[in-house]
C-alpha cells in the first residue's frame, strides 16, 4: 500500500518481548507523530514499534493488528491514532473499535488518541462526524477498562483559533509543534495509568 510503513515482524517481536514495549498503530496522523512519540517514549524506557499507513481507515488498522497478533508480535501497550479516515462512514467505527479491543485482549493497555477533523471546506460536517466518533470511543471505554482515551480532540476544540491553527494547520494533521504536544499527552496518559 502507498505510504504503508511498518517494522518487520522480528523487530516487532523484540519490542513485544519488553514489558514496556509500545506499538504505534494508525494513519497519516500516526505517521506524523511517529518520530516525536518514539523519542518521547524511549526517554522513558518504552521502546516503540509501528505500523501506519496514510489514508488508512480503522478497519485496515484492525486488520493489521490481527496479523501482528497472529505473528505473536503484539506488545503489552498499544497507541492507536485512527478515526480521521472514518468520518465518511462513522456507523462502521464501533465494530472496528471492538475488533481492536478483542484482538488486544483485556491484559493489554490501549491508548487511543481521540480523532478530530475540521477541514476549512467542511468544518460543520467534519465536527459533527468527529463528535460522533468521540462518543463511540467514550462509550467503548466504559465497557473496556483497559481502553484509555488521550483527549486530543478536546484539547484542540478548547484552544483559541491561533493555537488551533499552530497545532493543526490543515484541521487534521498536527504540525511539528502539534506532534510534540500530542506525544506529551500520550506519555502523560500512559504515566497516569502507572505503566
Where are these regions (language model features)?
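Alpha/beta-hydrolase-fold catalytic nucleophile elbow
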Residues: 81, 113-114
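A short helix->loop->beta-strand "cap" motif at the edges of active sites that frequently abuts
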Residues: 105-109
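Conserved beta-strand termini and adjacent loop/short-helix elements that scaffold enzyme active sites
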Residues: 51-53, 113, 150-155
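Membrane/wall-proximal cationic-aromatic binding patches
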Residues: 1-20
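Catalytic His-Asp segment of secreted/periplasmic serine-dependent ester chemistry enzymes
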Residues: 121-195
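Conserved SGNH/GDSL esterase-like catalytic core that processes O-acyl groups on lipids
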Residues: 15-99, 119-122, 128-131
